[in-house]
Amino acid sequence: MITQRFHYIFDAWGLNPKTLNNRKLVDSLLKDMAKLCKMRIIGGPLIVQGMDYNPGISGFCIIDFSHISIHTFSGPGEVCVDIFSCKPFNPEEVRTYLLKKLKVSKKNLFFFQVNYPAKPGKFSSAKISFATAQARKLQMANSTREA
């Protein structure tokens, strides 16, 4: 048996670019999500401004059970949040919080859980296929938006 893993990815688009280019917002998102997950920040948050050719902000904190990261892309108005933990947490609370805090509509917030096997080397192809299908859906939605 391997250590339990809880890994959720939240991607949102169609946000106000000015909102996403805010270091204080990213800092508060990291701190608030750690509290929502009932975990303690033991390193960070580290907040870094993007480059002119790739504007946005990245934030990262180490929590007592793993990490939380955020990447904003202010140009296209997108944000990616990744929470990886060895302790269970309620992803719906995080989803609800992000919807409210980022002022994003439900149709523009995509999230999924990465499922890990109970035994090393025993990934379920169905679970991987689901994640792949969801990622393809997101790519299609993005390409439709850009067209």
Where do the PLM segments sit?
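Polybasic/polar functional segments that serve as interface/processing modules
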Residues: 1-147
